[in-house]
């Protein structure tokens, strides 16, 4: 450049100044993971549409020892006892069935997932929630392994608590990865929508404008159901999502169940009540920034731990006892702050003597802080739009 004559340098600068800069579109990364939201949404749509539009097992999904093949080779007997899983095994290349015994000495059948992303889709129920005590189905363990796995049922998941089946069976372990569990896809009052960052959530059908609707196949449109009951679910590490969509008429969505979300920034969305059985239902957020969303139902603090945010939808209610917020190990509230958002028909019941403190502004939300001597170092911040605080 220094060798260019001075007279030409001026002309060169004029030409550079006249250039029109290239227009580069803004790239948004709402969750800060280094990937553009548009790319995440496109990948998520392909992933979810595959599961939403294909029901691999149209009836119930279960295993039952085949008594007609008692003297057949072990492989034949196993195949007949797990015949309901045939299509799912075909669709998840590399997945296999095996068997062992549970703690009670009963035969238990095991789904061993593929090395990739498993897709298990069921038109009706997984397990035996629709059965009475006289109907025999074997215990099961579902291990999807690592990968971004998804399980969807049109109806229920687990065992029928109302028939006295209080012992936990049908253990589910989804392994490492960003996994998804949807129970109650047949709830015709709701749409599942895809947000810009690739995450999903459920909304009432008149609110579907807040995201892109991903429709369920009509094979999920089965009879009454939508409850998680009598089972243990471990979502594993990763940013996991659980949608417990409940019954169309409302009522209990989770009863007598343990749901462990694992390390990661997880979300569980519940339509209906959370109740205990012979022991409280337990939903743990574990390490990470975790969110519990409840609509048209209530949850008590004895049923959850390790959550940093609670979103109360329409007619959503949470009752908090201070000592329940003091977690152990991975179930502490990260940062010692629990934020609760909602609206005028949401309700927060603070049990005991809470001290009302300062207000905090975060975006368009104004919070009021509450503390209790039984939960030292923990602040509960409640959205001022929630007017029912008792």
State what each model feature region is.
Residues 346-390:
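Low-complexity acidic/polar repeat-biased segments
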Residues 57-64, 69-73, 77-151, 205-224, ...:
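N-terminal segments that cap or nucleate solenoid repeat domains
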Residues 1-59, 72-74:
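Beta-rich interaction/scaffold domains
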Residues 112-113, 122, 144, 153, ...:
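Glycine-centered beta-turn/loop sites at beta-strand termini
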Residues 46, 57, 65, 69, ...:
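Extracellular beta-strand repeat scaffolds in secreted/surface proteins
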Residues 104, 116, 125, 136-138, ...:
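Conserved consensus positions within extracellular tandem repeat modules
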Residues 28, 36-38, 99, 109, ...:
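Short linear proline/tyrosine/threonine-rich motifs used for host-factor recruitment
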Residues 86-87, 108-109, 118-120, 140, ...:
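Solenoid scaffold repeats with emphasis on beta-solenoid/beta-helix
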